[in-house]
Amino acid sequence: MSGPNGDLGMPVEAGAEGEEDGFGEAEYAAINSMLDQINSCLDHLEEKNDHLHARLQELLESNRQTRLEFQQQLGEAPSDASP
C-alpha cells in the first residue's frame, strides 16, 4: 500500500524501531533556519506593505485636497471674472 506521497507504507513496528532514522537535530535545525528566513522575508514584505499603504494614504489625501481646491476655484471663477 502506498502512502500519501506514493511511498510504500511502513508497518507500525518498523516505524517504532527506526525512530532514530527520522528527523535528527541537523534536520530540525535546517528546517528552523528555513522558517526563520521565511519569517524574515514576510516581515520585510509587511514593512514594505505598510510603507506603501502610508504613501497611498498620503496620495489619496493630496488628491482630495487638490480636488477641493479645483472645485473652489471653479466656484469662485465667475465672481473673480467680473470687474
From Swiss-Prot:
Residue(s) carrying Phosphoserine: 82
Family: Belongs to the UPF0184 (EST00098) family.
Superkingdom field: Eukaryota
Gene responsible for this protein: BBLN
GO molecular function per UniProt: molecular adaptor activity
Name under which the protein is recorded: Bublin coiled-coil protein
Job description of the protein: Essential for intermediate filament organization in intestinal cells, interacts with intermediate filament and regulates intestinal lumen morphology.
Organism: Homo sapiens
Keywords: Cell junction, Coiled coil, Cytoplasm, Cytoskeleton, Phosphoprotein
PANTHER family reported for this sequence: BUBLIN COILED-COIL PROTEIN, UPF0184 PROTEIN C9ORF16
Pfam name, any one: UPF0184
Region listing for Disordered, in residue ranges: 1-24
Manganese recorded as keyword: no
One GO cellular component, as annotated: intermediate filament
Segments forming a coiled coil: 25-74
One GO-annotated biological process of the protein: apoptotic signaling pathway
Subcellular location field: Cell junction; Cytoplasm, Cytoskeleton
First-listed, main subcellular location of the protein, grouped into a coarse class: other
This protein's record includes keyword Ligase: no
